[in-house]
Design a protein with these regions (language model features):
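Intrinsically disordered, low-complexity segments enriched in small/flexible residues
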Residues: 1-109, 277-328
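Short hinge/gating elements
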Residues: 61-64, 125-129, 270-273
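Short, motif-level signal for alpha-helix interfacial/capping segments enriched in acidic residues
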Residues: 33-36, 136-137, 230
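Terminal peptide-recognition signature
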Residues: 15, 56, 112, 159, ...
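Short active-site-adjacent helix-start/loop capping segments
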Residues: 70-72, 120-122, 164-166
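Conserved catalytic cores of soluble enzyme domains
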Residues: 158-288, 292, 296
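Glycine-rich beta-alpha loop segments
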Residues: 53, 92-94, 100, 105-157, ...
Length: 328
């Protein structure tokens, strides 16, 4: 699969193409172009270091949305064994935006709940662009309760722009479905580990994100609102999305500082889409470590720590009181 660069990656892409052309020319015509190629390789390394070492929040959002980025099922193929997908919420339908099922991870049987996007128009229509309906969240809850019944930990892979806001979704009470998941996950009597692997959009992400450990990939984001929507509300113009992204503190690095997430999972240089296997290996290692930490806890302690974890979220500051005379 040929790499499709983002706008800010164009200088890297152009250098890589030039380097490839030189190598092909050297091989084809048996010409020694090693000095030129070494110079170009040095320039490429420096360009990569400069661009990827200084990514803005908005650039990380673009990487998180990259159409070639590995999705949940790509990680399931690489990190899990004996995957069996289960379907339906037993009320209305099966939501293909949220594949959920049973799998083996690190020799242990577990429940896996996910969001899934598509790579082309046909797949995106089937997956609803990763935007789940109420039946998706109810299916996820059905499987989590199954995991609780049989003592299986829950692993959640989050990658959604947000829950689907269509008329049918509202008629079937999407807000209620998410709210019930928040309540039930808080008291689920088995360990829960969540990982934001791409987009973590608002309540749609949080609906399967109440966990004992929350991981996030290096270039993923987790936010109450998309930068474009925030820009449209605050500036009445979507063109301020980059400024909104900075203000929202939605990057993995900001979220870790704010203690919203517990661990940042490293990605290869350029993003997860540049190397699926190494990203999957990093995620698998992080998930295994997180599960080891929480699986050894007694149930009562597990639930108390989960409750306190979410009670501690958020910071506030107080402004100085200004008297009426001072205002005058």
């Amino acid at each position: 699969m040929e790499w499709q660069p983002l706008d800010f990656e164009r200088p890297i892409f152009d250098l890589e193409r030039r380097l490839e052309d030189l190598k092909n020319h050297s091989d084809k015509h048996d010409v020694d172009l090693d000095p030129a190629m070494k110079d170009l390789e040095a320039k490429l390394r420096e360009t990569r270091r400069r661009i990827y070492g200084n990514l803005t929040a908005w650039q990380r959002v673009q990487i998180a949305r990259h159409t070639q980025r590995p999705f949940a099922l790509d990680y399931i193929d690489r990190c899990f064994a004996n995957w069996v997908e289960l379907h339906g919420d037993r009320r209305f339908a099966d939501d293909k935006a949220m594949p959920c099922g049973l799998a083996t991870f690190g020799g242990q049987r577990c429940v896996v709940i996910t969001h899934q996007k598509g790579r082309n128009t046909k797949e995106n229509v089937m997956r609803n662009f990763g935007c789940a309906h109420p039946e998706g969240y109810r299916k996820a809850l059905r499987l989590m309760r199954l995991g609780e019944k049989f003592g299986m930990p829950v692993i959640s892979l989050i990658d959604t722009p947000g829950a689907f806001p269509g008329i049918g979704s509202e008629e079937r009470h999407i807000s209620e479905a998410i709210a019930v998941n928040l309540r039930e996950m808080m008291t689920l009597r088995v360990p829960i580990v969540a990982a934001v692997i791409g987009e973590g959009g608002s309540g749609g992400a949080l609906g399967i994100g109440v966990a004992d450990r929350v991981l996030i990939l290096e270039n993923a984001y987790y936010s109450v609102i998309s930068p474009e929507a925030c820009s449209a509300i605050l500036w009445r113009d979507r063109r301020h999305a980059a400024e909104a992204a900075e203000a929202l503190k939605l990057t993995a690095q900001d979220l870790f500082k704010l203690e919203i997430v517990d661990e940042i999972v490293a990605e290869p240089e350029g993003g997860a889409h540049r190397d699926y296997d190494s990203t999957a290996a990093n995620l698998s290692k992080a998930l295994r470590g997180a599960l080891q930490q929480v699986c050894q806890l007694p149930v009562a302690e597990l639930l108390e720590k989960r409750y306190q974890k979410f009670r501690r979220l958020g910071v506030f500051s107080e402004g100085k009181t200004v008297s009426a005379s001072a205002q005058a």
